[in-house]
Amino acid sequence: MTKLIFMGTPDFSATVLKGLLTDDRYEILAVVTQPDRAVGRKKVIQETPVKQAAKEAGLSIYQPEKLSGSPEMEELMKLGADGIVTAAFGQFLPSKLLDSMDFAVNVHASLLPRHRGGAPIHYALIQGDEEAGVTIMEMVKEMDAGDMISRRSIPITDEDNVGTLFEKLALVGRDLLLDTLPAYIAGDIKPEPQDTSQVTFSPNIKPEEEKLDWNKTNRQLFNQIRGMNPWPVAHTFLKGDRFKIYEALPVEGQGNPGEILSICKKELIVATAEGALSLKQVQPAGKPKMDIASFLNGVGRTLTVGERFGD
């Protein structure tokens, strides 16, 4: 039985962990995840999905604020683990820890070398990629730069957003890891170096990148909106107030960018630099998320054709 330390944080990681727990070839000696955080306006302390899964399985849990140089790292190195599996952990692993293991692999939610970094699923959508995927890779000190052990792709559809793609790729990652790990541990797979000429980066999204620029095409804005749904959520401004857009569809239309072209009971169409967007799910300032019909029947009932979204 191979003894593992698992490191991860969000739902994506929890799915991978649960997969490992179903395979009797592995023993999870410890789980490392990010510390509990205060979430929302009420600052409710929330455990990570990986911590919740680990508690349900009765596993030992470590939550260092920073792994490097921590007492927790020293404890982990004394457990006698054969290797480390990480999946969206959110911290760099110190070389000292990596060097103490027989192997260390990462489940990364992109088709490397494209989309290295912390937001690969977001950027796959924002940049209009036709496919997404998962790469199992060896861990090295440089971010997502290790040799690739295996890859698996799936198509991106127009119905996908960050939430749906996370769910799909979590299952892909779980299955690919379980399919790959035995042969890798046995030495039957020769990892492939990444083509550095094809590397792209997908860092965590900055607040200023959430703002919609109506001078882009309808397709570009469509991709940005779904590439931030359900988090961090794209926004614009309406009458000076922040206005979040969770879902919109590209449609035909022509007008000044940001201009309202059409309003009816269940449709609000806004011009872009090329074509238009039909807004489907929105959140006005100080209100909950709602469908467009609810918005137009409520706080949006005073809107008129010709008014504009934007600064």
From Swiss-Prot:
Record-level GO cellular component terms? cytosol
* Keyword Protein biosynthesis belongs to the record: yes
Q: Please give the Gene3D superfamilies that the UniProt record associates with this protein.
A: Formyl transferase, C-terminal domain, Formyl transferase, N-terminal domain
Asked if the Swiss-Prot or TrEMBL record annotates the protein with the keyword Transcription regulation, the reply is no
Catalysed conversion reaction: L-methionyl-tRNA(fMet) + (6R)-10-formyltetrahydrofolate = N-formyl-L-methionyl-tRNA(fMet) + (6S)-5,6,7,8-tetrahydrofolate + H(+)
A Pfam family of the record is Formyl_trans_N
> What positions does the entry give for (6S)-5,6,7,8-tetrahydrofolate binding?
110-113
Instruction: Provide a Gene Ontology MF annotation, just one.
Output: methionyl-tRNA formyltransferase activity
EC number of this enzyme: 2.1.2.9
For this UniProt record, give its keywords in alphabetical order, as a comma-separated list.
Answer: Protein biosynthesis, Transferase
Q: Which EC class heads this enzyme's classification?
A: transferase
HAMAP family the UniProt entry points to: Formyl_trans
User: What role does it play?
Assistant: Attaches a formyl group to the free amino group of methionyl-tRNA(fMet). The formyl group appears to play a dual role in the initiator identity of N-formylmethionyl-tRNA by promoting its recognition by IF2 and preventing the misappropriation of this tRNA by the elongation apparatus.
* NCBIfam families the record matches: fmt
**UniProt similarity note:** Belongs to the Fmt family.
**Mind telling me what this protein is named?**
Methionyl-tRNA formyltransferase
Organism phylogeny: Bacteria, Bacillati, Bacillota, Bacilli, Lactobacillales
